[in-house]
A protein has these predicted regions:
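Nucleotide-sugar donor-binding/catalytic module of glycosyltransferases
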Residues: 1-104
Length: 104
């Protein structure tokens, strides 16, 4: 069965303490036809290097580093970049069950 592409949009701002667990849980989804759009919203901590490390390991990740403009503007940019038939928003302190996207 053909799986439609799901775009997972993750705005990030100063989330270094939660980010590895969050992105790791997104990458581990049992539903594999996903694009992961990570938008670093001008973080001043080590969030960007954490995101870059995940991008280097997973080609499904699109990483955008931008000036801080707030979460609403950042989510809207993610929507503009999304190519999926469906969209999921995830916050940087979320941890997803492996079947989260499959249940969509």
């Amino acid at each position: 069965m053909n799986q439609p592409l799901v775009s997972i949009i993750l705005p990030v701002y100063n989330a270094q303490n939660h980010l590895a667990r969050c992105v790791g849980s997104i990458c581990a989804q049992t539903y594999s036809n996903i694009e992961i759009i990570i938008l670093n919203d001008g973080s001043k901590d080590q969030s960007l290097p954490v995101c870059e490390a995940f991008r280097a390991k997973d080609p499904r990740i699109v990483l955008v580093d931008k000036e801080n403009s707030g979460v609403a503007d950042t989510r809207n940019l993610g929507l503009k970049l999304a190519g999926g038939k469906y969209v999921q928003f995830v916050d940087s302190d979320d941890y997803l069950d492996p079947d989260f996207t499959a249940a969509l």
